[in-house]
């Protein structure tokens, strides 16, 4: 669900940019900052990893209602979200380096 909200935020920003480029007025003035979105994404990654770790601990302690397949699925989701975060960081660093190497 959080990933869908993040994607919707990116799509709305792209639509607003496209409308601004074509000279149209945007109907919804969203004041979402890039830093805020990045911070929220990092918080979601951290929350997902924490939840997976807690569920793994509960499974290890033998709490009823915790299935191995649920633990493995949550661990995999946490791993994929971490890898996605790393790739986003790599792209941001590459874009920053490219901008810094431009001649003015």
From Swiss-Prot:
Pfam family, one: FliE
Keywords assigned by UniProt, alphabetized: Bacterial flagellum
GO BP of this protein: bacterial-type flagellum-dependent cell motility
Primary location recorded for the protein, binned into one broad class: other
Organism domain of life: Bacteria
Localization: Bacterial flagellum basal body
InterPro entries: FliE
Any single GO CC term annotated in Swiss-Prot or TrEMBL for this entry: bacterial-type flagellum basal body
Record-stated family: Belongs to the FliE family.
PANTHER family: FLAGELLAR HOOK-BASAL BODY COMPLEX PROTEIN FLIE, PTHR34653
Protein name (database record): Flagellar hook-basal body complex protein FliE
């Amino acid at each position: 669900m959080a990933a869908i909200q993040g994607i919707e935020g990116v799509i709305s920003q792209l639509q607003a940019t496209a409308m601004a480029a074509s000279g149209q007025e945007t109907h919804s003035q969203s004041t979402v900052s890039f830093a805020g979105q990045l911070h929220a994404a990092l918080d979601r990654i951290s929350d997902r990893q924490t939840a997976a770790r807690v569920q793994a601990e509960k499974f290890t302690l033998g709490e009823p209602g915790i299935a191995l397949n649920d633990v493995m699925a949550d661990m995999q989701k946490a791993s994929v979200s971490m890898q996605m975060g790393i790739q986003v960081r790599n792209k941001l660093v590459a874009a920053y380096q490219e901008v810094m190497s431009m001649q003015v």
